[in-house]
C-alpha cells in the first residue's frame, strides 16, 4: 500500500 507521507 502506497500513501503520501505528510512531509
Curated annotation (Swiss-Prot):
Keyword Secreted listed: yes
Name of the protein described by the UniProt record: Bradykinin-potentiating peptide 7b
Pyrrolidone carboxylic acid modification, residue list: 1
Family: Belongs to the bradykinin-potentiating peptide family.
Top-level taxon of origin: Eukaryota
GO cellular component: extracellular region
Tissue specificity statement from the Swiss-Prot or TrEMBL entry: Expressed by the venom gland.
Keyword annotations from UniProtKB, A to Z: Hypotensive agent, Metalloenzyme inhibitor, Metalloprotease inhibitor, Protease inhibitor, Pyrrolidone carboxylic acid, Secreted, Toxin
Localization per Swiss-Prot or TrEMBL: Secreted
GO biological process assignments: regulation of blood pressure
Keyword NAD in annotation: no
Function as written in the Swiss-Prot or TrEMBL entry: This peptide both inhibits the activity of the angiotensin-converting enzyme (ACE) and enhances the action of bradykinin by inhibiting the peptidases that inactivate it. It acts as an indirect hypotensive agent.
A single GO molecular function term of this UniProt record: toxin activity
